[in-house]
UniProtKB/Swiss-Prot annotation:
It catalyses: Hydrolysis of DNA containing ring-opened 7-methylguanine residues, releasing 2,6-diamino-4-hydroxy-5-(N-methyl)formamidopyrimidine; 2'-deoxyribonucleotide-(2'-deoxyribose 5'-phosphate)-2'-deoxyribonucleotide-DNA = a 3'-end 2'-deoxyribonucleotide-(2,3-dehydro-2,3-deoxyribose 5'-phosphate)-DNA + a 5'-end 5'-phospho-2'-deoxyribonucleoside-DNA + H(+). This is Formamidopyrimidine-DNA glycosylase. It comes from Cupriavidus pinatubonensis (strain JMP 134 / LMG 1197) (Cupriavidus necator (strain JMP 134)). GO terms for molecular function: 8-oxo-7,8-dihydroguanine DNA N-glycosylase activity; class I DNA-(apurinic or apyrimidinic site) endonuclease activity; damaged DNA binding; zinc ion binding. The lineage of its organism: Bacteria, Pseudomonadati, Pseudomonadota, Betaproteobacteria, Burkholderiales. NCBIfam families: fpg, PRK01103.1. DNA binds at residues 97, 120, 165. Monomer. Involved in base excision repair of DNA damaged by oxidation or by mutagenic agents. Acts as a DNA glycosylase that recognizes and removes damaged bases. Has a preference for oxidized purines, such as 7,8-dihydro-8-oxoguanine (8-oxoG). Has AP (apurinic/apyrimidinic) lyase activity and introduces nicks in the DNA strand. Cleaves the DNA backbone by beta-delta elimination to generate a single-strand break at the site of the removed base with both 3'- and 5'-phosphates. PROSITE patterns: FPG_CAT (PS51068), ZF_FPG_1 (PS01242), ZF_FPG_2 (PS51066). InterPro entries: DNA_glyclase/AP_lyase_DNA-bd, DNA_glyclase_Znf_dom_DNA_BS, Formamido-pyr_DNA_Glyclase, FPG_cat, MutM-like_N-ter, Ribosomal_uS13-like_H2TH, Znf_DNA_glyclase/AP_lyase, Znf_FPG/IleRS.
Length: 284
C-alpha cells in the first residue's frame, strides 16, 4: 500500500509536469472505485488550470481553478492499495486497470496524459468545491493527525497525545489520528530506530522515548522519500520508476533474518491484522 513517502514522491514527480497546465479532456473508464467517481466530474474539470498540488496524509490534492471566474476546487486522489498516477507523453492504449485520464495542455500546445491506474480499485478520485480555508473540514481530511514534518510534531506532541492510551504504540501510529502517514512499513522501521518494542502501550512511553520516536519517524520518512519510496509489488512513481527504500529496511519483511545491528533473528508478529517486525534485543 502506498504510504506517505510514496504519495510525496508522486506529488514531487507531478509538480514540474502538471502544475500550470489546463485540463483539456477527462476520460473516466470505471467509476466504481473505493467511492464512486462523480457522474459530472468530466464537466467540472474540463478547462480548469491545475494551480497547485499539495498532500495531506496519503491524499494528493490538486487545486483546479476556472481562470474566467477564479472559482477553485480540489481534486482529491487516494492511491488505495495498488494505485499509481503516471505522467505519459502521449495516450497509449488503456489497460484493464487504467480507470481515469486527465489530458493536460500547456500554453505552447504540448499535451500530456495523467493516468490513474488501480488494479484493486481501493483508490479514489473525488472532486471538492471547498475553498482552501474550508478544505481541512472535508469528511476525509478532518480526522487526520498532524503532519510528521510539521514543526509542531515532536516528542512533546507525541507524549501529550498518547497519555492514557493503552493500545500498542505501533497500533497508535497506524491509526493516523495523532500523526499521519506512518504506515505499516515505516512504523516498524521507526520503532526499530527508536529502540521501542511495537507492543509497548503508548501511554507508558516516557517523554525521552517519545522524543526519540518522533525523531525516528521524521528521519525514516525523509530517507524513504529520498529513496523514491518502497516498491513491494505495485508502486511506481509518476515517471514509472520503482522505489528502493525496502532494500535498506532494518526489520520490515526480514522475519528470521539476523538483525543488522546485533544479529538476533528478526521476529514477526501480527497486530491488528498487519505484520509487525522487530528485534527482541534492540527494542524494549
Amino acid at each position: 500500500m502506498p504510504e506517505l513517502p510514496e504519495v510525496e514522491v508522486t506529488r514531487r514527480g507531478l509538480l514540474p509536469h502538471v502544475v500550470g497546465r489546463r485540463i483539456a479532456d477527462v476520460t473516466v473508464r470505471h467509476r466504481g472505485l473505493r467511492w464512486p467517481v462523480e457522474d459530472d466530474l468530466e464537466a467540472r474539470l474540463a478547462g480548469r488550470l491545475v494551480r497547485r498540488i499539495e498532500r495531506r496524509g496519503k491524499y494528493l490534492l490538486l487545486e483546479c481553478v476556472d481562470e474566467a471566474t477564479d472559482d477553485a476546487g480540489w481534486l482529491l486522489v487516494h492511491l488505495g492499495m495498488t494505485g499509481t498516477l503516471r505522467v505519459l507523453p502521449d495516450a497509449p492504449p488503456a489497460g484493464a486497470h487504467d480507470h481515469l485520464d486527465l489530458v493536460l495542455d500547456d500554453a505552447g500546445g504540448s499535451r500530456i496524459v495523467l493516468r490513474f491506474r488501480d488494479p484493486r480499485r481501493f483508490g479514489a478520485v473525488l472532486w471538492s468545491p471547498l475553498s482552501e480555508a474550508m478544505l481541512p473540514g472535508h469528511p476525509l481530511l478532518r480526522g487526520l493527525g498532524i503532519e510528521p514534518f510539521d514543526s509542531h510534531f515532536d516528542g512533546s506532541w507525541l507524549h501529550r497525545h498518547t497519555r492514557g492510551r493503552s493500545a500498542a504504540i505501533k497500533t497508535v501510529l497506524l491509526a493516523g489520528n495523532i500523526v499521519v502517514g506512518v504506515g505499516n512499513i515505516y512504523a516498524s522501521e521507526s520503532l526499530f530506530r527508536a529502540g521501542i518494542r511495537p507492543t509497548t502501550p503508548a501511554g507508558r512511553l516516557s517523554l525521552a522515548r517519545c522524543e526519540r520516536l518522533a525523531q525516528s519517524v521524521r528521519e525514516t520518512l525523509a530517507q524513504a522519500i529520498e529513496r523514491g519510496g518502497s516498491t513491494l509489488r505495485d508502486f511506481v512513481g509518476s515517471d514509472g520508476a520503482s522505489g528502493y527504500f525496502q532494500l535498506e529496511c532494518f526489520v520490515y519483511d526480514r522475519a528470521g533474518e539476523p538483525c543488522k545491528v546485533c544479529g538476533t533473528p528478526v521476529r514477526q508478529i501480527v497486530q491488528g491484522q498487519r505484520s509487525t517486525f522487530y528485534c527482541t534485543h534492540c527494542q524494549h
